[in-house]
């Protein structure tokens, strides 16, 4: 009888497991499809067609119902685009194409690659049925001017910019009991934080202690950050970031955003970089967790809403003016937090500091134009380090896709077209970038193996998007990379030498003999197949911005605090100096986002709404 019962329990368990898998599969499919938009009545000549094009993260497949003269229906069947970024284009572009009967509609701001992929997939679908896509390229009429409605709103804290810093500040201020309005000019939240791939640096954390890492102290973190920033950063801000980093990691655990893996990052002497357990890109991971918190806390998040001016009264920030397509807003607030990001997509502004950057590739999203900096300057705020603009050494030039330090932290190396390493691959970003710019042909390759691919999830998208070159042997990979003559054997020798260096390092801590590398050497690159990605430097981070103090209070040009005005994240300057350390941007926006949220909440607790009777 016991055996029968056990057998029955086993069958039920298996059935439940299968049912769970089916439900999960349905959920996964559902999350990557969109509802069909268009007519329910179609012509007798209409065909149901499918087409595919490459998006940012993978293939985008669409289904189109059309005849020679009209598109009746469009739906996106499958995609792998980033939630809250590419998915905005997936949601909004098919209706726009249908309503205008045109593929000449504007791309969705900040999601250009996904937008173009949807258009190309529709073209492929039409062509597969023998239909002429040029019929659907008619010019789209400009939208008629709208008489905007004037609206006044009130809140305790208004936060401008819904990237990582803005979301963090909003959540933290709300946790302190404040009513928050969060504004975002783009059609999605997350900003550049969605593009952060590596991790968050932090010192003296519980995670490090559990992993037996004892030398990643606050003092070492401060020293590494100042040294790699060429001692231009404000030591007080750097120490504030380091001293508050462990508590910030604890807070992330408390909001169901644990970072449980720790590795080294470029140029540092110790392991500080905290990552999600499965190796997924840290930015998407944290933004999604912060969005959930914002929703659960009932924060008033308004996308497609651009702040245009800080309202001042008797020298104090008392709100902002903002606008969307239909409204002009005056938002009265007890305190204002600026978290609008840097200006890495404002080529005119960057070129005013460095003309060589006018035509450079950028890893930044299109909304990173420095709006908050300009608004702050308009009310007397000072700025710092505006001419310090960072190049990242491993950028795919086709579209500005970043290959994070995390890949090198797990053992990848960089070689030139002669098949040789030419720098400590994990030196500071500026050092590696400048070394690359001196190499023949103007580009290099980052190399990794199957073991690293299996360990680091973010490498999968490079394969899926067709950015990788592969080979079953070092020689085959070199040939597929287009290396010529002696460069092929040079590459084979380089890889063998590297693997020997890793073995020595693991045995007794001996640094890499060629270039002195002494971190990111836990595993060699010996597991076939082997991968290469063609890369070169690209604009990545603007270190300069609004001047703040350790309370995230904005400082004016006379050196005084502007009451009621706070700032955090890449819109500020003084934290990274002349070169930002990989992993410090995330630390910056979480730590100073929390500080700005707390400071704004404390200020709000002690003042009345300016327009209150």
Predicted regions and their residues:
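Conserved N-terminal/central alpha/beta ligand/cofactor-binding core
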Residues: 179, 188, 192-300, 304-306, ...
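Core beta-strand elements of the Rossmann-like FAD/NAD(P) dinucleotide-binding domain
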Residues: 152-155, 325-335, 561-562
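Glycine-rich loop(s) and the adjacent beta-strand/alpha-helix scaffold that form part
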Residues: 324, 331-396, 592-595
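Beta1/beta-strand and adjacent pyrophosphate-binding region of the FAD-binding site
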Residues: 146-165, 181
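A glycine-rich dinucleotide-binding beta-alpha-beta segment and adjacent secondary-structure elements
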Residues: 309, 490-579
